[in-house]
């Protein structure tokens, strides 16, 4: 009796439904892994930390990492404290928001100017074509935080507000909208700095308005100009030289907000 020929497994043609299912499962696995990473980051890092001695930075790098150890030493000549933010892609906006509102607790004149500009900002965005219904809740949260400062809240209570996920994220969304609005209003100027053949509007839709998109020079310039708040960023990376590189946005202005930038991340600095 002749041996039975082994049955050949029927192969699915390329581009079949099974391939699509495999791709979907792969995508879902990646998303699940990313969610786990984000959850781990969230557990380990508050949205905005307590104020810490700047010396905590030394422990984040190996003792023989001479480049960073030297740059931290240089930074220590100019600043005494740091307040860390969660590395979630929204750190620039959160750091800016907390730093400036905290400073306004001791600057009533700037508080009134900032409140007036912020109150009018929704009207400016609507006049540009942003939908009032869409942005209203975010603007209300922004104004609520400013009014909390106006009532002389404590730093601890302001910090609690910034560590409330929904409040903090609504603030970030609104600051992103303000950044987008300014870039689009001044599109003739900013179009020269955008790569990839994109329009300013496309850049804003892809790189500014979505949550968790990291920020660069162009975002900082736009937000500083939109709210007339000067920002000084100390850049610390592996570049040569034992000092951090300070940049003031806009150039020549008197800084109100001080931030530390390490590749992909912003924290708050204090003199």
Swiss-Prot record:
Outcome reported for the amino acid change (mutating residue 265 to A): Abolishes ability to inhibit RNF168. Does not affect ability to deubiquitinate RPTOR
Name of protein: Ubiquitin thioesterase OTUB1
Record-linked PANTHER family: UBIQUITIN THIOESTERASE OTUB1, UBIQUITIN THIOLESTERASE PROTEIN OTUB
Effect of residue 23 to S: Does not affect ability to deubiquitinate DEPTOR
Enzyme Commission number: 3.4.19.12
Note: In the structure described by PubMed:18954305, the His-265 active site of the catalytic triad is located too far to interact directly with the active site Cys-91. A possible explanation is that OTUB1 is in inactive conformation in absence of ubiquitin and a conformation change may move His-265 in the proximity of Cys-91 in presence of ubiquitin substrate.
Post-translational modification: Phosphorylation at Tyr-26 by SRC and SRMS promotes deubiquitination of RPTOR via a non-catalytic process.
Record-annotated membrane-spanning stretches: none
Site residues, Required for proximal ubiquitin-binding: 23
Species annotation: Homo sapiens
């Amino acid at each position: 009796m002749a041996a039975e020929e082994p049955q050949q497994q029927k192969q699915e043609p390329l581009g079949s439904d099974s391939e699509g299912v495999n791709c979907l499962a792969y995508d879902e696995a990646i998303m699940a892994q990313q969610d786990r990473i984000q959850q781990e980051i969230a557990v380990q890092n508050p949205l905005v930390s307590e104020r810490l001695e700047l010396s905590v930075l030394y422990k984040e790098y190996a003792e023989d990492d001479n480049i960073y150890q030297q740059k931290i030493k240089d930074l220590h000549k100019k600043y005494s404290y740091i307040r860390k933010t969660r590395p979630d892609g929204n750190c620039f906006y959160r750091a800016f928001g907390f730093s400036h509102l905290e400073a306004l607790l001791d600057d009533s004149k700037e508080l009134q100017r900032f409140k007036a500009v912020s109150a009018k900002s929704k009207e400016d965005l609507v006049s540009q074509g942003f939908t009032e219904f869409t942005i209203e809740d975010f603007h209300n949260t922004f104004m609520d935080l400013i009014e909390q400062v106006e009532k002389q809240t404590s730093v601890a209570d302001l910090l609690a507000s910034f560590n409330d996920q929904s409040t903090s994220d609504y603030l970030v969304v609104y600051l992103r909208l303000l950044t987008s609005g300014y870039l689009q209003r001044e599109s003739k100027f900013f179009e020269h700095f955008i790569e990839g053949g994109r329009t300013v509007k496309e850049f804003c839709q892809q790189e500014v308005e979505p949550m968790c998109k990291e920020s660069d020079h162009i975002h900082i310039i736009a937000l500083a100009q939109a709210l007339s708040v000067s920002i000084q960023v100390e850049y610390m990376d592996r570049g040569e030289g034992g000092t951090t590189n300070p940049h003031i946005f806009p150039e020549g202005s008197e800084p109100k907000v001080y931030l530390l930038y390490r590749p992909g991340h912003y924290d708050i600095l204090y003199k």
